[in-house]
Structures are given as C-alpha cells and as structure tokens.
Amino acid sequence: MSLNADYQKLEPGNEVRLFSVDGTAFGMSDVLRFHAHNIAHTPEEIEAAGGDENKLPAKSIWWQGEEYKAWPCQVEGIEATTDGTSPQPKLTVANLDSSISALCLAYDDLLQAKVTIHDTLAKYLDARNFPQGNPTADPSQEKLKVFYIDARNTETDEVVEFILSSPMDLQGRMIPTRQLHSLCSWCIRNKYRTGDGCDYAGTRYFDKHNNPVDDPSLDECNGTLTACKLRHGDSNELPFGGFPGTSLIRS
C-alpha cells in the first residue's frame, strides 16, 4: 500500500505533518526539525514520572532517522490555487523563551532559510516511535512541500510569523523563462561563444547575414539554425537553443 492509495480512502489514517527549517547555507549549525502534534504519554511513562504527566516533556517524532521535536506551530495558505499564482503561506511558531527572536537576530530574520513540510501517515513512521516497533514503517511514503522564508511578518513575546515563498518566487523568476520560437535563445541573450548555453569556440567566422569572414571581430551569430550548422557542421550535434518546428506554425 502506498501513501497515494491511502489518500484515496475515506479514512486514510492519522495524518502527520513535520517541519524542517534549514539555514545551513548562511551559517546555522543545525537543521531545525519540529512538529505540532500532541502525543499522549503511555501509562508506563506516566507511572515512571510518579503519576504526574506534567513532569514529562512533549514527545518527539522520529522520521527518516531524524528527530522532530515538539514545538507549537501552524502553517496557513499552502493550498494550491487555480489562478496560476503561487501560494504564499504563513508559518507561525511559538517564541518560547524568545528563542526564535534570538535566531532572527543572529541570522537576519532567517531570510532564505529552506522550509520543508513533510506530510505522511502515522503508520509509516519510524519503528522507534512505537514501543513494539512498526512493521509498516516506510520512510519513502511522504509528500513534500518546499518553501523559503521571504520575510518576518510578525514578532511578539508569544509567536513569530514568517511569510514563505516558493523557490521560483524567491528568485524572482517568471514563467516561461524561454519562449518557443525559431531563433536561438542563447543568441538572443548575448550568450554566443560564452559556454553558457552556446559552447561554440571554433574558428569559422560568419557575419550576421551568414557570409564567411576572416576577421573574428566581424563574427556575429544571427540566431538561426542555419548559422549554427555553418559553425558546427551539418553532421555534428548542435547546441541550438531555439525550436525550429515553431516556424511551421502560422497564426
């Protein structure tokens, strides 16, 4: 049975959501892993605490060999939309003992930290979560959502709220990054002979009209498939960055 098949059921089982915040790219020493589930203690654990459950710490969840500690948090707005816009969720975490405020001060509000949301079911959790083990443990059964911290929105003594963005939004990219037309994208972006897309480094020179020239300073690619073939040869692999078939389409 797979997670996808479970989600098709009327009662898929107990859902588990785990969070990880990775700021190692800008100097954080550890990945922060946490969950917001209230997991009951066993009678044996309560008895060992002298019958006072308040003496027991909140229980961690182990997933894929990593410990996710209990920490009050919630995420809103991660649902997909139908209008083509990317979601911009809000992650709210408890500011216990001002610990999150301290992280914000130390690491520039955790901007661009990678936030990964793991969704799975309790029956797939690591065996060490269960006193008797777990024969259905399967670390591959999860759904991932990845965002990056784009801004710190609210900060109080109780909570800190972060605005998340998709990786594409954070980098300011637009869709599509390439247009479908018959001209070479590398040429249009002035990347002829740069090695970034266009790797031509030969000694065949042509002007913008595809006429052969001896002076390298007159060498200019016009971005056509013909220009690419003249330089690389008809029988060689071409790094052409266009879509020749689009020239057959007429509006």
Swiss-Prot record:
Pfam families the UniProt entry points to: Phage_tail_L
Cofactor: binding comment: Binds 1 [4Fe-4S] cluster.
Cellular location(s): Virion; Host cytoplasm
Any one biological process term the GO annotation gives: viral tail assembly
Cofactor: [4Fe-4S] cluster
Chain sites annotated for binding [4Fe-4S] cluster: C184, C198, C221, C228
Keyword annotations: 4Fe-4S, Host cytoplasm, Iron, Iron-sulfur, Late protein, Metal-binding, Viral genome ejection through host cell envelope, Viral long flexible tail ejection system, Viral penetration into host cytoplasm, Viral release from host cell, Viral tail assembly, Viral tail protein, Virion, Virus entry into host cell
Cellular component annotations (GO), alphabetically ordered: host cell cytoplasm; virus tail
Domain of life the protein comes from: Viruses
InterPro entries attached to this UniProt entry: Phage_lambda_L (IPR006487)
Gene Ontology MF, one: metal ion binding
Record note on domains: The C-terminus coordinates an iron-sulfur cluster.
NCBIfam families to which the protein is assigned, alphabetical: phage_tail_L (TIGR01600)
Stated role: Part of the distal tail tip complex which plays a role in DNA injection during entry, and in tail assembly initiation during exit. The tail tip complex is assembled successively with three tail central fiber proteins J, one tail tip protein I, one tail tip protein L and one tail tip protein K. The tail tip complex interacts with tail measure protein to initiate tail tube assembly. The formation of the tail tip complex is completed by the addition of tail tip protein M, which is followed by tail tube polymerization.
Family of this protein: Belongs to the lambda-like tail tip protein L family.
Protein name: Tail tip protein L
Organism: Escherichia phage N15
Lineage: Viruses, Duplodnaviria, Heunggongvirae, Uroviricota, Caudoviricetes
